[in-house]
């Protein structure tokens, strides 16, 4: 009997590891939306070339993701496989954290496996490639799992780890991590004071101080300017959030546009089924005075509410469907503790909804690739990305911007050939952020992303434009740039959008493919 339990305890995590890896590997290798798909490709590679985010190029989020990707490139080689391996590993980490969280509540292995398989299906595979929002989402969930475990099971070492998770989640993406950190801090202070947990507080304080020292040491060792960090990672993103919450005309996403029945309920119906069920179960619990269960439910409800509101304010496709198995599992725990286990029907209904919704969103996001806006495209026309370079194998290339993938492949190959033959000091501005890696050359990227509405970097109308412009010109001068290449889909990246970034510099324009590919040589200005 003991050996059987041991085998189950070993076999289930192994199955989850294999499944979490393979489902993300399958999803991540189909389709491309360049601005998202390659967001951490060249930035991660640039770190290996000692060109660092914030210090040498503009980012406003994803700092930890960049360095983590650099680590994967260093350990496993600079290739697409290492890139997908990174995302698949985070999917494994999130799934295993969920598994061991549920194990604390003594649920049988079968339902835990169902919930975790659903989580692995609906979590990272919706994107498939490294994505700052999903890193922050998963690390924020892990923070919540650890906090609940620390509060209910009185484990001091977890209190020490929590501040490290704060840093990891926040420097993956500022939101939703900031809200989750605030939630945990609120409940933690209440826990320390109400229960007089001096030992818990001491471990938490030690973790806070040590993690802060490590972070400051990192800034010192990488020579990352504090001023640049504050502007790029704090002040500029605040202007984006303010615009969205205030529904300003220039905001990429407006809160007022999100407040409609279809968006609020239709897109999240399966989440809401479990959310409101758990909400009403929690209200009933107040009359039974089960403090631990009330605490669990309230923390999970507030966490999911934060994720839901944060999702509404994002310009991306929905990525929080993995809240479905999370909420379902918490309802399962409530039924079990409240002796609902005597009736099988509630559990059957839970499993049916979880399995059905998992299959539905697996088809829509992991197979049809809705996250990349290619759900209506025939995937059979996809082209092997290895035609561009063998290091992009086994990616299947198909994007929403070209009806024929071959045309986009040819455009990229022509650009690679021309840029490789140019031995001048170069800069490339593109969302095909893999040129530095494929050419094994520092191409002096300016940003991770390039949108012209103050949502990725300050443009002329933004109050921090001069800060950004100063950085651009400093990089141009320091790296002795002689020519700037622009590459994108039709009218995506035009020189007219960037020419005002440069001080007293004149250019000779050369158009290769109109509105798609051009290069601009720096020349002596004529009086």
Question: Which residues are covered by each model-predicted region?
Answer:
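Transmembrane-helix motifs of polytopic, lipid-linked glycan transferases
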Residues: 85-106, 142
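Transmembrane-helix signature of polytopic, membrane-embedded enzymes
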Residues: 98-121, 291-296
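Membrane-interface transmembrane helices that cradle and orient dolichyl/undecaprenyl
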Residues: 103-106, 141-160, 193-195, 275-293, ...
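Membrane-interface alpha helices of multi-pass inner-membrane proteins
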Residues: 120, 158-176, 180-185, 210, ...
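Short acidic/glycine- and proline-prone juxtamembrane loop motifs at membrane-interface regions
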Residues: 126-136
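Specific aromatic-rich, kink-prone transmembrane helix
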Residues: 135-153, 158-166, 187-190, 326-330
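Short hydrophobic alpha-helices at membrane interfaces in multi-pass membrane enzymes
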Residues: 146-168, 197-206, 293-302, 343
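Short periplasmic/luminal acceptor-recognition loop of GT-C membrane glycosyltransferases, typified by
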Residues: 367-370, 379-453, 482-492
